[in-house]
């Protein structure tokens, strides 16, 4: 059985639970419980603080972990990145009082910077030849300049609304982060086989994201032109219709190009276009 360490609460918790549910990993409960076993797949989920996850995986307390890249890089634990998951995206940035003009990184020389990520900050400052005084704070880093504890902060930024409410401005993006699936380097053969099945399910879910299944009626005399504008996985499915001169075309479209392609299809005479969501996609 595989043990997966995940964050006990917050945005990463919510998105991790959604991924497991979409991968048909059923959990009996996730509330006020440290360890929960799946009822239909050989995994159990261990709920931890996000900053404890890298160490738990590196030491073998857990076989896998779903953790923010920012925490993984900061902790420098000996675990491997298995998959980038593409959610819980954020950035680690330097921010300063918004009413002070920012001339560049040299401004931080001799300044006090509050952060929960001293390792990443120190490496960045050294690589840019900046000498600053780092104050390590856990939680509510954004209030440090306002109470005179620091001149600036280095912290996670998602929407930027927290900075605005504390009269701060983002001036340097140091790192971009997303959720990672990390693994212990010494998993047994049996656990790796379970991991392969888990990855198969996760890949099917992630591949289907931002994809739509499209069905349409197409005039046969325009079929070649219609197929030419479809960027499907290999080639679209074409089936005859009862009405002479018409056929049904089925394909998969990337949502980013959906309206662009639909417009071209309509111009070529496609009718009765039906669009459906895709839950999972196996290639």
From Swiss-Prot:
Family annotation (Gene3D superfamilies): 3.30.70.120, Periplasmic binding protein-like II
Source domain of life: Bacteria
InterPro entries on file: ATP-PRT_HisG_long (IPR020621), ATP_PRibTrfase_cat (IPR013820), ATP_PRibTrfase_CS (IPR018198), ATP_PRibTrfase_HisG (IPR001348), HisG_C (IPR013115), N-reg_PII-like_a/b (IPR011322), N-reg_PII/ATP_PRibTrfase_C (IPR015867)
Cofactor: Mg(2+)
GO CC, one annotated term: cytoplasm
Main location: cytoplasm
Free-text activity regulation comment from the record: Feedback inhibited by histidine.
UniProt catalytic activity: 1-(5-phospho-beta-D-ribosyl)-ATP + diphosphate = 5-phospho-alpha-D-ribose 1-diphosphate + ATP
Any GO BP annotation: L-histidine biosynthetic process
Leading EC class: transferase
Pfam families assigned: HisG, HisG_C
Enzyme Commission designation: 2.4.2.17
Pathway: Amino-acid biosynthesis; L-histidine biosynthesis; L-histidine from 5-phospho-alpha-D-ribose 1-diphosphate: step 1/9
Molecular functions per Gene Ontology: ATP binding; ATP phosphoribosyltransferase activity; magnesium ion binding
Disulfide bonds listed in the record: none
Subcellular location: Cytoplasm
Keywords for the protein's UniProt record, in alphabetical order: Amino-acid biosynthesis, ATP-binding, Cytoplasm, Glycosyltransferase, Histidine biosynthesis, Magnesium, Metal-binding, Nucleotide-binding, Transferase
Protein family membership: Belongs to the ATP phosphoribosyltransferase family. Long subfamily.
Chain's role: Catalyzes the condensation of ATP and 5-phosphoribose 1-diphosphate to form N'-(5'-phosphoribosyl)-ATP (PR-ATP). Has a crucial role in the pathway because the rate of histidine biosynthesis seems to be controlled primarily by regulation of HisG enzymatic activity.
Name this protein carries in UniProt: ATP phosphoribosyltransferase
């Amino acid at each position: 059985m595989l043990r997966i360490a995940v964050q006990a609460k917050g945005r990463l918790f919510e998105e991790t639970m959604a991924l497991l549910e979409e991968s048909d990993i059923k959990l009996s409960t996730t509330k006020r419980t440290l360890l929960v076993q799946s009822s239909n797949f050989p995994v159990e989920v261990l709920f931890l603080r996000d900053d404890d996850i890298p160490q738990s995986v590196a030491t073998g307390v857990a076989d896998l972990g779903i953790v923010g890249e920012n925490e993984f890089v900061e902790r420098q634990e000996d675990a491997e990145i298995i998959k980038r998951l593409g959610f819980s995206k954020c950035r680690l940035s330097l921010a300063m009082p918004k009413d002070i003009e920012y001339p560049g990184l040299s401004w931080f020389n001799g300044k006090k910077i509050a952060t929960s990520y001293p390792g990443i900050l120190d490496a960045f400052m050294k690589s840019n030849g900046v000498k600053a005084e780092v104050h390590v704070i856990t939680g509510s880093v954004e209030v440090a300049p306002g109470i005179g504890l620091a001149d600036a902060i280095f912290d996670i930024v998602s929407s930027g609304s927290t900075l605005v409410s504390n009269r701060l401005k983002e001036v340097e993006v140091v790192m971009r982060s997303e959720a990672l699936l990390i693994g212990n380097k010494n998993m047994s053969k049996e656990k790796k086989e379970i991991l392969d099945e888990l990855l198969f399910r996760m890949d099917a879910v992630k591949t289907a994201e931002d994809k739509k299944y499209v069905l349409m009626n197409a005039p046969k005399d325009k079929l070649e032109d219609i197929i030419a504008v479809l960027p499907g996985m290999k080639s679209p499915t074409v089936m005859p219709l009862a009405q002479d001169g018409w056929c049904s075309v089925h394909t998969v479209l990337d949502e980013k190009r959906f309206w662009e392609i639909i417009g071209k299809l309509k111009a070529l005479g496609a009718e009765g276009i039906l669009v459906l969501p895709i839950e999972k996609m196996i290639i």
